[in-house]
């Protein structure tokens, strides 16, 4: 039987660093105000690179690490809420930029859960036996959709991309998963609203591209629903919580990680964090964190670690995977 494994991880972030002090010069905020509430100290902001540019850098690095040619890739999935355009897909742009002539490519939109949803879908595709190698990338240029006059959202987000190479393997690595959506609460986090508009419509409404968030509702959702889902998944696995080596969670807020560790009953030291440097990068946050953990030696891609990956955000969406990495 064919299974899927994560064989490589890579990330790329824009070079421009925007600190909390930088933000305090253009809005009513301060380093202390932002850090005490979120843990975020700085973020990367793109100056000219679009989402496909960031994702392509990740794709090239994955190929380099694996000593593969682009033509050997079977598929490319890009999880994003900030595509270059609605058409062509960002994934198709990546396919063209790296020369993956044999790959089919598509985008997946599930906000901050996007990488988890994409990884779950890609694993099934490899497991079908029809595909051998795929790139799964989370990439965002959130600075495109931020209202820079709104300090409640502008201080939170950053730009970046991360991804993995998924390959066929004879051993099982993806052990358990739990994927959820609740559209009835979707108004808590929105962006990119396009009004119905034509010479034949009678709707008097304008487009609104900016991201809007009910911060308290999203915070409560993460602590209540997501931590419950993670606990239920661990119980479903018949593993003790201690058997999970690392919890790689979406990097939204340091206080969410603190509270989730307590709710789950896990050692807080097993929850690495990097939102201090990058802010909330939505679909890119988990793969960036994974790639950094591999880079610094915390995690080795040799199947020796049991890792729980979990994303949560707009939709509402949330999902977790227990993976041997």
UniProtKB/Swiss-Prot annotation:
Gene Ontology BP term (one): fatty acid biosynthetic process
Keywords: Acyltransferase, Cytoplasm, Fatty acid biosynthesis, Fatty acid metabolism, Lipid biosynthesis, Lipid metabolism, Multifunctional enzyme, Transferase
Its EC number(s): 2.3.1.180
Pathway the protein contributes to: Lipid metabolism; fatty acid biosynthesis
Cited InterPro entries: ACP_syn_III_C, ACP_syn_III_N, FabH, Thiolase-like
One Pfam family this sequence matches: ACP_syn_III
Domain of life the protein comes from: Bacteria
Subcellular location: Cytoplasm
Active site per UniProt: 112, 250, 280
Entry GO CC: cytoplasm
Reaction(s) this enzyme catalyzes, per UniProt: malonyl-[ACP] + acetyl-CoA + H(+) = 3-oxobutanoyl-[ACP] + CO2 + CoA
One MF term in the entry's GO annotations: beta-ketoacyl-acyl-carrier-protein synthase III activity
Predominant place of localization: cytoplasm
Record region (ACP-binding): 251-255
Assembly: Homodimer.
Function: Catalyzes the condensation reaction of fatty acid synthesis by the addition to an acyl acceptor of two carbons from malonyl-ACP. Catalyzes the first condensation reaction which initiates fatty acid synthesis and may therefore play a role in governing the total rate of fatty acid production. Possesses both acetoacetyl-ACP synthase and acetyl transacylase activities. Its substrate specificity determines the biosynthesis of branched-chain and/or straight-chain of fatty acids.
Comment, domains: The last Arg residue of the ACP-binding site is essential for the weak association between ACP/AcpP and FabH.
Family, as annotated: Belongs to the thiolase-like superfamily. FabH family.
Name by which UniProt lists this protein: Beta-ketoacyl-[acyl-carrier-protein] synthase III
């Amino acid at each position: 039987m064919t299974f899927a494994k994560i064989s490589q991880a890579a990330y790329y972030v824009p070079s421009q660093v925007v600190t909390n002090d930088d933000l305090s010069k253009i809005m009513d905020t301060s380093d202390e105000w932002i850090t005490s509430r979120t843990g975020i100290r700085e973020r990367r902001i793109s100056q000219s690179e679009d989402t496909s540019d960031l994702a392509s850098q990740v794709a090239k690095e994955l190929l380099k690490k694996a000593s593969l040619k682009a033509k050997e890739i079977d598929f490319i999935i890009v999880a994003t809420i900030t595509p270059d355009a609605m058409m062509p897909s960002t994934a198709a742009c990546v396919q063209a930029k790296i020369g993956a002539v044999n790959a089919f490519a598509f985008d997946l939109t599930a906000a901050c859960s996007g990488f988890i949803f994409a990884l779950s879908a890609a694993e099934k595709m490899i497991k079908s036996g029809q595909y051998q190698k795929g790139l799964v990338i989370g990439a965002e240029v959130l600075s495109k959709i931020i209202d820079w006059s709104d300090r409640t959202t502008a201080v939170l987000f950053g730009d970046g991309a991360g991804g993995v190479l998924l390959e066929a393997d004879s051993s099982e690595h993806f052990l358990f998963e739990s994927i959820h959506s609740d559209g009835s609460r979707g108004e808590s986090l929105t962006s990119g609203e396009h009004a119905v508009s034509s010479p034949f419509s009678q709707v008097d409404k304008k487009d609104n591209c900016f991201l809007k968030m009910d911060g308290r509702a999203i915070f409560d959702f993460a602590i209540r629903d997501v931590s419950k889902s993670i606990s239920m998944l661990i119980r479903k696995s018949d593993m003790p919580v201690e058997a999970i080596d690392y919890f790689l969670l979406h990097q939204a807020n340091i206080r969410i990680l603190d509270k989730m560790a307590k709710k789950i009953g896990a050692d807080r030291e097993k929850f690495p964090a990097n939102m201090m440097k990058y802010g909330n990068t939505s679909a890119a946050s988990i793969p960036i964190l994974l790639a950094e953990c591999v880079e610094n030696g915390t995690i080795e891609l040799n199947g020796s670690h049991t890792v729980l990956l979990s994303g949560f955000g707009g939709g509402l969406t949330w999902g977790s995977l227990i993976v041997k990495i």
